[in-house]
Amino acid sequence: MLINRPRYYPFYIFLLLSHFVYAQNAASGKITDAKTNKEISGVDVFINESNKPAITTTSGNFMVQSDSIIYKLKFLRKNYALETVDITPENATNIFVKLSQEKISDIQEVVIHNERPKYKNKKENPAYAIMQKVWARKRNNGLDKFDTYTYKEYEKIQFDANNLDSAFMNRKIFNKLEFIFEYKDSTASGKIGLPVFLNEAVYDNYGENRPSKKTKRLLVAQKTSGFQDNQIVTLTAKNLYRDINIYDNTLNYFDIGFPSPVGETGFSTYDYNLIDTVSVRGENAFKIRYLPKRTDVLAFQGYLYIDTDSYAVLGATLKSTQKINVNFINGISTELEYDNPDENTFLPRKFVTEIEMTPFSKKKTAKSIVAKRSVDYSEYEFNKPLEDKIFKRTEEEYSDSFTDKDDEYWVKARPDSLSKSEKGIYEMLDKLGQTPKFNRIVKLYETLGSGYYNVKKLGIDIGPIFSVYGKNEVEGDRIRLGARTYFTRNDPWRVQFYTAYGFKDQQVKYGAEARFMFNRVNRFTLGAGTRRDILQLGVQLTNDDGIMARTFASSTIFARGDNASLSSLNQTNLFTSIEPWKNFQIRLDGTMQSIKSANPDGFSLMYYKDGALRKTTNDSHFTLSLIARPGAKFSQTGIDRYEHGTLAPTIVLKYTRGIEGLFGSDFNYNKLQFLFYKPFLVGSWGKLQVNFEAGKNFDTVPLALQNIIPGNQSYSLAQNTFAQLNYYEFVADTYTTLHLEHHFNGKILSFIPLIKKLKLREIAFIRGAYGTLSDASKAINVEGFKYSAPTDHIYYEYGFGIENIGFGNLRIFRVDFNWRGNYLDRPDISTFGVKAGFQVNF
């Protein structure tokens, strides 16, 4: 429910960048025939990626205006080749355009006026015959066919603020920041624009397919305007984009699936219309226009350029519909170019994606951030011998030397030179970084995003601010204060602690942990910590042994029924971890702990040991964890990393060995646990989240060390718990659980009139648990007769939820409706419940 996680950073960055804003909103000039130099009329003039011409000229002169940025004009007239002009403040007037009948044009998105033809069935559509041949000859990325390959990648990400006016400049927030408007562009319509962020990066890519599969993407150089030390801004910039393959059936934007117009299922979503044959970089190509059959679903519109001989995709344009139902997003536009070295493969050439983002409003005139990412792929080399050491991680890769490149390097590295406005971003933000007021604004949003307030002079973060207050039956009102060391985003060590006080039990609680990473390559780390606290155990199966790991200590302010099943925990932990391979971690924990009931009158953890009755469970154990995150991407190289949004799975295998007699431990036991979690895109039907867990205690242990099927008696959303289970209702020596949660992204509700205007999104879920509990495990506990496992039947819950509740682009509320499927004869159960919470995502 809390929103202090890296995946929520886009929400905060939109709020920040909405204050700082580049625009050119008018352009004029003359159009002539390139051969005769005579003026031409009847020319369609298109602004940016618009599907409709802004004007059709009646003379050789033209003038266009727009409420948004004009960065490109396209000119088209029958029997003439398309001409494109990039617009900057310097060339926006007196543009001289020459149209030629003989020029071979690059890929461009234009509209040739024609009605959408109607066919009795798709087989009558000539575009269908073409697409069938595209599917039959579906190409694979050419990199897969070679034994080895290398190529360079230049990436540029730019944020421009849009749709500002003179009144905005006069706001108090810009007091003492007026100098930023020296970089503005004023237009005839009175709007103002301002560049706010620029990031450039150069990568060397290496790959080997045979004899073994290896890849490496090496960051060679990076240059960021003013935000090198701001984790939120840089992470957000990188986190907006995903790699896509136009031949896939589903394209991933923001981890949301959009049907691909080139996918084999495309005709179920799109109408296709063969427009013409055109020349694309010297190749003859079919130009096919596609439109979604329904504009209120997640889909694109645009053009496909298909080679007339090989039926390869030479290029494509993808533009979102006006009714796009994605939070914080007003529009998406992508241009793709491919090279086709042979009849079976393709190679990426250039990808350009623009995303228009607003934190609140969907209106076209709303103040927004236009985020543009362009990637150029070049210098392909194939079957060149590559040494094994190239694929090995080295310490140099994790240093900051890639930020030390001089201006001369960047002039050579860029495929195209920077515009005047792009160069101004570096200068402006360097000045902003020296301005106290700007730094205070950045700190505010960084605090909201990270959950910590940084005291830079001391190198300390205070927080997390979202855990300051809590309430439970034992402690009553609870105040928690914490801090951690934080000097830079790449700190190799961290010390953190917290202290808490309950006004009902009048007890002080605390926790502290120190960690040090010795090697950035294999992330070899040692850590130690201790805590004394009141916790809600039994709400996680595959839990983390770390002292500062997420717990359910006292965050339940509103709950159904009395929650008396809290435990008092004294715990000390030592651990070491290493990543021998990328995204694969081996961790060994040694833990000594004592557990007793924090509320003996309402909740018993008493058990029998050698005929004696005991109330405290003393435990010493070692835990070996194998954690795999294939495909995960991270920012920073320090002790704490920030994860980019991906569909990477999480796979965990844990073995725990309890040792009797070690530091007074009461039990020998062996436990094995497994966890698998992964989100799957299911075409245009949304995203399915799968969470499977299984485990077994091989020995008899008391309740404090048992596997508890996680319940949730709060009214808040809690991932991977059972909403209608009470705490400790099911206890198991052996267990399996499965959680399936499908997000339809509004697919079903979009069919319902009136309701679809609300842009709500539906969720369906089902959860199940099965387990066994031995008689010995029941007998060891004083109140063992109360506990049982879901053995007779698989316990299950089901329900649906509504997410995306809110207004405009601010739709962060979710409500779930849960039903208990069986075991309905038990006392004090709840058969139906409502959970709610905040969920900040796209």
Residue locations for each model-derived region?
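Structured extracytoplasmic
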Residues: 111, 116-285, 291-299, 361, ...
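Short, ordered, surface-exposed loop/turn motifs in non-cytosolic proteins
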Residues: 25-27, 34-49
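Short, acidic Ser/Thr/Gly-rich low-complexity loop/linker segments typical of extracellular
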Residues: 50-61
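Conserved "repeat-terminator" motif of extracellular CCP/Sushi domains
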Residues: 95-114
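Exposed, low-structure sequence patches enriched in small/polar residues
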Residues: 256-258, 382, 391-842
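A short, solvent-exposed loop/turn motif at the edges and junctions
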Residues: 47-49, 74-85
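A short, amphipathic beta-strand motif
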Residues: 27-33, 60, 97
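Short Pro-Gly-centered beta-turn/loop motif in secreted/extracellular proteins
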Residues: 37-41, 63-70
